[in-house]
């Protein structure tokens, strides 16, 4: 009996332990993170970051779908939330971070604006007026914070970026023309005609007393040294002070001398260039062939010997000379610019006396484009402008001009160019 009672006493705690273990296992099995269950009692699963619920659980398990980059996003783990549309930055907003599957876009106001927390709109930053300076800059959701400039500082400009600036302190060699205020800096001026000295105190003296005195003319080397140094020094420990003058008074004559030298040199250079150009033009004019215009028919040519010759009879006596010259002119391949001025004027007159489009056809044969040809019509004499422009080219040979005239059926001009101008030489 005693053993049976003891066994039953041991079964009580065992039964209680088994009961508690079963309850805990049952509770662990029933725990569901989402707190949602299907109709069959299965725990509904949640969609991860970057995924949204396409079909919530009910009769079936939860169906998830990925969010579209730059279109939708999901930044929570949920069994009910679908993908949300991305925020668009509009108006005064600019995008500081793009919209991705797991994060929305981040917008911020443009420079000079901040986002008002109450309205959510971009507002213009506050401007610190003159006499006030920046304490905290305007950015994100914070407006500009300004303060009045304290003593020793100033701000002479209204803006939202600059703090109060420290006032200028005049040097010992300067005098103050205007005090520094909250709105304007101090203004200093160099003291003219004064020497500032600092002497080494005698042995046993505790202080150095600055003094001023009228200047004496220093040697040239000392003046240059004082201009460069600009400070008072003591030579070899002597108690005699070495005085220097402000650099401004000494440098002004130097600057003026340099400026005058530059101006004179520039004027001389321009004059030399113009003289050289005129000289070259004069030499070029002298090297051109002499204008040999034909004298009127029957005019008498006089030589230094006093013998007169009839130009018409001379022309009749020398036909072979003209023929040879014409052949040389026709095929020598020389430049058009080497023709006598009278011959070029004759060609211009013949072209001017022709039909209105003759010179245009010639310009086309010489290689000019229509727009360039039209530009010659603005000149007083289009034909002269055309031939002068063409004569500057390396290809402006007489053969090229003759070939172009033949192509436009102007044999009369070809004959005129190939015929020698009537000229006589003294007998």
Swiss-Prot record:
Topological domain ranges for the Extracellular compartment: 29-250
Q: Which UniProt keywords apply?
A: Apoptosis, Biological rhythms, Cell membrane, Cell projection, Cytoplasm, Developmental protein, Differentiation, Disulfide bond, Glycoprotein, Membrane, Neurogenesis, Phosphoprotein, Receptor, Repeat, Signal, Synapse, Transmembrane, Transmembrane helix
**Topology: which residues are Cytoplasmic?**
273-427
* Record-annotated membrane-spanning stretches: 251-272
Which GO biological process entries does UniProt record here?
A: axon guidance; cellular response to amyloid-beta; central nervous system development; circadian regulation of gene expression; detection of temperature stimulus; dorsal aorta development; extrinsic apoptotic signaling pathway; fibroblast growth factor receptor signaling pathway
Disulfide pairs here are 32-43, 44-57, 47-64, 67-83, 86-99, 89-107, 109-122, 125-138, 128-146, 149-164, 167-180, 170-188
- GO cellular component term of the entry, any: endosome
- Residue ranges annotated for the Death domain, each copy included: 344-421
Q: What is its main location?
A: membrane
The cellular location(s) given in this protein's UniProt record come to: Cell membrane; Cytoplasm; Perikaryon; Cell projection, Growth cone
Its record classes its membrane topology as: Single-pass type I membrane protein
Mapped TNFR-Cys repeat ranges: 31-64, 66-107, 108-146, 148-188
Keyword Membrane assigned: yes
Q: How is it modified after translation?
A: N- and O-glycosylated. O-linked glycans consist of Gal(1-3)GalNAc core elongated by 1 or 2 NeuNAc.
Positions of region (Mediates interaction with KIDINS220): 326-341
Q: Which CDD domains match?
A: Death_p75NR, TNFRSF16
Q: By its UniProt entry, which SUPFAM superfamilies does this protein fall under?
A: DEATH domain (SSF47986), TNF receptor-like (SSF57586)
Is Transmembrane helix among the key words of this record? yes
Question: Where do the record's glycosylation annotations fall on this chain?
Answer: 60
Q: Where is this region: Disordered?
A: 194-219, 281-338
Residues of the signal sequence? 1-28
Tell me, how does this one assemble?
A: Homodimer; disulfide-linked. Heterodimer with SORCS2. The extracellular domains of the heterodimer bind NGF. The cytoplasmic region of the heterodimer binds TRIO. NGF binding mediates dissociation of TRIO from the receptor complex. Interacts with RTN4R. Interacts with TRAF2, TRAF4, TRAF6, PTPN13 and RANBP9. Interacts through TRAF6 with SQSTM1 which bridges NGFR to NTRK1. Interacts with BEX1. Interacts with BEX3. Interacts with KIDINS220 and NTRK1. Can form a ternary complex with NTRK1 and KIDINS220 and this complex is affected by the expression levels of KIDINS220.
**Classification via PANTHER family:** TUMOR NECROSIS FACTOR RECEPTOR, TUMOR NECROSIS FACTOR RECEPTOR SUPERFAMILY MEMBER 16
Explain the purpose of this protein.
Low affinity receptor which can bind to NGF, BDNF, NTF3, and NTF4. Forms a heterodimeric receptor with SORCS2 that binds the precursor forms of NGF, BDNF and NTF3 with high affinity, and has much lower affinity for mature NGF and BDNF. Plays an important role in differentiation and survival of specific neuronal populations during development. Can mediate cell survival as well as cell death of neural cells. Plays a role in the inactivation of RHOA.
Domain note: The death domain mediates interaction with RANBP9. It also mediates interaction with ARHGDIA and RIPK2. The extracellular domain is responsible for interaction with NTRK1.
- Name the UniProt record assigns to this protein: Tumor necrosis factor receptor superfamily member 16
Q: Which source organism does the UniProt entry give?
A: Homo sapiens
- Point out the gene that encodes the protein: NGFR
């Amino acid at each position: 009996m005693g053993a049976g009672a003891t066994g039953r006493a041991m079964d009580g705690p065992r039964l209680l332990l088994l009961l508690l273990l079963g309850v805990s296992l049952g509770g662990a099995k029933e725990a569901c993170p989402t707190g949602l269950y299907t109709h069959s009692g299965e725990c509904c699963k949640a969609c991860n970051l970057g995924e949204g619920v396409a079909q919530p659980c009910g009769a079936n398990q939860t169906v998830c779908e990925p969010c579209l980059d730059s279109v939708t996003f999901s930044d929570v783990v949920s069994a009910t939330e679908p993908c949300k549309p991305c925020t668009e930055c509009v108006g005064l907003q600019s995008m500081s971070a793009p919209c991705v599957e797991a994060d929305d876009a981040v917008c911020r106001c443009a420079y000079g604006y901040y986002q008002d927390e109450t309205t959510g709109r971009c507002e213009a930053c506050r401007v610190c007026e003159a006499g006030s300076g920046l304490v905290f800059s305007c950015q994100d959701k914070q407006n500009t914070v300004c303060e009045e400039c304290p003593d020793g500082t100033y701000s002479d400009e209204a803006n939202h970026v600059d703090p109060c600036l420290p006032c200028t302190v005049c040097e010992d060699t300067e005098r103050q023309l205007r005090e520094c205020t909250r709105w304007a800096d101090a203004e200093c001026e160099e003291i003219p005609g004064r020497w500032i000295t600092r002497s080494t105190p005698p042995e046993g003296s505790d202080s150095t007393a600055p003094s001023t005195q009228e200047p004496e003319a220093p040697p040239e080397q000392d003046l240059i040294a004082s201009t460069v140094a600009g400070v008072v020094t003591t030579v070899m420990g002597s108690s005699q002070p070495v005085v220097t003058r402000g650099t401004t008074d000494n440098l002004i004559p130097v600057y003026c001398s340099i400026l005058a030298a530059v101006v004179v040199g520039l004027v001389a250079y321009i004059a030399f260039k113009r003289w050289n150009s005129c000289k070259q033009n004069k030499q070029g004019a002298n090297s051109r062939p002499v204008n040999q215009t034909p004298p009127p028919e029957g005019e008498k040519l006089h030589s230094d010997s006093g013998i007169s010759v009839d130009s018409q009879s001379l022309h009749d006596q020398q036909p072979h000379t003209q023929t040879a010259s014409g052949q040389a002119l026709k095929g020598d391949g020389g430049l058009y610019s080497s023709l006598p001025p009278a011959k070029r004027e004759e060609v211009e007159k013949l072209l001017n006396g022709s039909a209105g489009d003759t010179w245009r056809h010639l310009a086309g044969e010489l290689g000019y484009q229509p727009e360039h040809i039209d530009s010659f019509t603005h000149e007083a004499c289009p034909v002269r402008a055309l031939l002068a422009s063409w004569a500057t080219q390396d290809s402006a040979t007489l053969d090229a001009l003759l070939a172009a005239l033949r192509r436009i059926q102007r044999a009369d001009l070809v004959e005129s160019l190939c015929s020698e101008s009537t000229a006589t030489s003294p007998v």
